[in-house]
Amino acid sequence: MDLENKVKKMGLGHEQGFGAPCLKCKEKCEGFELHFWRKICRNCKCGQEEHDVLLSNEEDRKVGKLFEDTKYTTLIAKLKSDGIPMYKRNVMILTNPVAAKKNVSINTVTYEWAPPVHNQALARQYMQMLPKEKQPVAGSEGAQYRKKQLAKQLPAHDQDPSKCHELSPREVKEMEQFVKKYKSEALGVGDVKLPCEMDAQGPKQIYIPGGDRSTPPAVGAMEDKSAEHKSTQYSCYCCKLSMKEGDPAIYAERAGYDKLWHPACFVCSICHELLVDMIYFWKNEKLYCGRHYCDSEKPRCAGCDELIFSNEYTQAENQNWHLKHFCCFDCDSILAGEIYVMVSDKPVCKPCYVKNHAVVCQGCHNAIDPEVQRVTYNNFSWHASTECFLCSCCSKCLIGQKFMPVEGMVFCSVECKKMMS
């Protein structure tokens, strides 16, 4: 498919998840409605990952596309209908007999993802070493956490030009080259094994806490096979604490088999969240999730959340923006050359600020213009003028004077306060 056709195919999938309730805003949100170019809901401004959107197939397609043309093709399967690669997510179902008064019932636990290992006991042990609130048990808080991290750590618009907004043919080509490069140089999937199993597979080096990587003992040298020794000769690359050989460890091939991590320590070095499904990016001796690896390589637009492949973009408030996306967060009007106010790290034009965000003066009960001086005490504000910041009893101007605040009112003296009580 040529670049022109790829550009024409682009769209953000506005029908996807339409009307889904927001898990954060509850009834305050009318239901999910994707903004035209921002990756947020038009109604409540929360991201799609905050809404109860059924995305299992879409997420499997996204991860499948990520693994396409990599060494991890064993983790994907192409649908016969359209040839789209689908992620072969490993689902683990555990059955535990539960004793009852008359008979034995079966308690079934389904993990929406589990490490693809042949030894189910090892996978089970891996899960038990994760914080309970992050174990992806179907219908649990952990499953919701995994879903949210899939959206956050591996945004589709970081790998698929068709998920981006109005890229030029040149930008499409540059993005495809960028994706090809990180697939060949940084992308990896963690491998769960017992540390002792790697002796024959990886380099004969181990990480010693407080020391250098050691070389194997000479032929004929005596080795201490005691359990105490084996519990201290391996240490986690992240927390530096020793590991027991009987506990599962995660290896990252791109990092080298002399490094290993506790399951709960296999996290992004920037956001410190568990690397979802053990998908990692390796750079400068550090683990990254997909999002933060891309952030280390390319500027990201604070408006649309996409990587910037254009030669021209703007920087404002310590953030990067496509020229066309430096807009008011409320009304989408272009802010270049206009007065704006930052509200929760989002730029808002002056009219929208006055209408939606400005504090109200306790004196005149009008919104306070962002360019006008004001007096603030606790959660109350006044215009810093002789007409507004007055004693609530005698109307004496209190600018530069001592005052007594009482539930939104201010007094110049105890006498005035008593008269109003």
UniProtKB/Swiss-Prot annotation:
GO terms for cellular component: cytoplasm; focal adhesion. Keywords: Cell junction, Cytoplasm, LIM domain, Metal-binding, Repeat, Zinc. Its main location: cytoplasm. GO terms for molecular function: zinc ion binding. It comes from the Eukaryota. Residues 155-164 have a biased composition (Basic and acidic residues). It is found in: Cytoplasm; Cell junction, Focal adhesion. Gene3D superfamilies: Cysteine Rich Protein. GO terms for biological process: negative regulation of cell population proliferation. It holds the Pfam family LIM. Interacts via LIM domain 1 with ZYX. Interacts (via LIM domain 3) with ENAH and VASP. Interacts with ALKBH4, talin, actin, alpha-actinin, GRIP1 and PXN. Interacts (via LIM domain 2) with ACTL7A (via N-terminus). Heterodimer with ACTL7A; the heterodimer interacts with ENAH to form a heterotrimer. The N-terminal and the C-terminal halves of the protein can associate with each other, thereby hindering interactions with ZYX. This is Testin. It comes from Ateles geoffroyi.
